[in-house]
């Protein structure tokens, strides 16, 4: 007896493939870092020496004798003292109340006078609404990270970015920082506080079993997106 193998039709296969792709998309959580620029930069090649053996060296690495070592070129490093403490509180409320009363008599025809001669009508209505809301947040982040100058703006400000990775047991911790630094705010110890950095972006994230345990399952996220409540 010849066996006949039944295969699903092309539309059925397409629907199944689409469903699998949708579930796979639900299984993935967007984890794009907020800092998209490069985390480091290489300094350009120094200029060739025009007078070998002279005291003055026009190369990139040359620094004047009495000049400090603060960063000012691409590839220089700077220490960021992260000291962020942000507190926010918000509260709101609304209360409305409206009432109304109406009394009136209804004139009736002569042949209905015996039934509705003294008919009076009244109406009353009330509308009341009360709502309150509140939110609060407190964030504290302290630490240090050394970053690299990735660009020098025409006004002399430094675009910096850097990354620090720490592997602790089964988790990989990431600290990323980027921003624009005014060279005048850099201290003699070659450091600056994060509160003095413009356009600062600070990111602290992790990868590992602990982070996965804190993440909602893909099937639960799928039904959460479909639930109407």
Curated annotation (Swiss-Prot):
Transmembrane regions: none
User: In terms of one coarse class, where is the protein primarily found?
Assistant: membrane
Q: Which InterPro entries match?
A: Flag_Lring
Which residues are modified by lipidation (S-diacylglycerol cysteine)? 26
Where does the record place it? Answer: Cell outer membrane; Bacterial flagellum basal body
* Signal peptide residue numbers: 1-25
Annotated GO biological process:
bacterial-type flagellum-dependent cell motility
How this chain sits in the membrane, per its record, is: Lipid-anchor
The record places the lipid (N-palmitoyl cysteine) at 26
UniProt subunit comment: The basal body constitutes a major portion of the flagellar organelle and consists of four rings (L,P,S, and M) mounted on a central rod.
Please explain the role this protein plays, according to its UniProt record.
Answer: Assembles around the rod to form the L-ring and probably protects the motor/basal body from shearing forces during rotation.
Family assignment from sequence similarity: Belongs to the FlgH family.
Query: What name does UniProt use for this protein?
Result: Flagellar L-ring protein
Organism (species): Burkholderia ambifaria (strain MC40-6)
């Amino acid at each position: 007896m010849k066996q006949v193998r039944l295969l699903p039709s092309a539309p059925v296969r397409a629907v199944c493939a689409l469903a699998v792709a949708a579930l796979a998309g639900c299984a993935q959580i967007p984890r794009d870092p907020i800092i998209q620029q490069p985390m480091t930069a290489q300094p350009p090649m120094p200029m060739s020496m025009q007078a070998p053996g002279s005291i003055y060296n026009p190369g990139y690495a040359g620094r004047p004798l009495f000049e400090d070592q603060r960063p000012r070129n691409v590839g220089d490093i700077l220490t960021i003292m992260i000291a962020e403490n942000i507190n926010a509180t918000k509260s709101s409320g609304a209360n409305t109340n409206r009432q109304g009363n109406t009394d009136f008599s209804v004139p009736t025809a002569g042949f209905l006078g015996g039934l509705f001669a003294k008919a009076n009508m009244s109406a009353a209505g009330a509308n009341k609404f009360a709502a309150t809301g509140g939110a609060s947040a407190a964030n504290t982040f302290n630490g240090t990270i050394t970053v690299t100058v990735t660009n020098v703006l025409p006004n002399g400000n430094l675009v910096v970015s850097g990354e620090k990775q720490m592997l602790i047991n089964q988790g990989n911790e990431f600290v990323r920082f980027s921003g624009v630094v005014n060279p005048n705010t850099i201290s003699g110890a070659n450091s600056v506080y994060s509160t003095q950095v413009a356009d600062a972006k600070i990111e602290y994230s992790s990868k590992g079993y602990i982070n996965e345990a804190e993440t909602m399952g893909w099937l639960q996220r799928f039904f959460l997106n479909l639930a109407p409540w």
